[in-house]
Amino acid sequence: MGKPTGFMEIARQTSTELPPEERIQNFNEFHIPLPQDEQQAQGARCMDCGVPFCQAGMMIGGMASGCPLNNLIPEWNDLVYQGKWDLAVHRLRATNRFPEFTSRVCPALCEAACTCGYTTGSPVTVKENEHAIVEYGYESGLLTACPPPTRTGKTVAVVGAGPAGLAVADYLNKRGHKVTCLLYTSDAADE
């Protein structure tokens, strides 16, 4: 942990959003990100707890707690704080096959499990830090499409197009197989 007192010295700060009246005019990004130095300061708020519940991804009392992907949250928060953005991208990709969209749609269970949130009432901005890492990855060319060098000629069908099905499809595609994802829908659900 780069700044042991970061959670006491630095207030939680999140990105601003364009008003809905402006958002409906186009399909552009409507979250206005923090400047990089301010985002790095948010990474310093992570306490690197002895037991980081934020990355635990477990059920407690029948409720989900922490990141279901077991993302190494304290590690990449510290890398963000240190300005080691390249390493943060690699660390995030170690546990998350799709950070480019999970950083946008994630319900941030990690923030609900954040010890800093329990002690100060203000959890670390994990979701925003993850999104900043992803945006840096695209801007720097670290996150790009990586087609396999050769194809095996085999075709595989994956039943299910949720996160698990897409992760399997991604893995098989990287191995050179042609993959088709099938999504099952019930006609009864439409009634």
Label every model-predicted segment.
Residues 157-178:
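N-terminal Rossmann-like FAD-binding beta1-loop-alpha1 element of flavoenzymes
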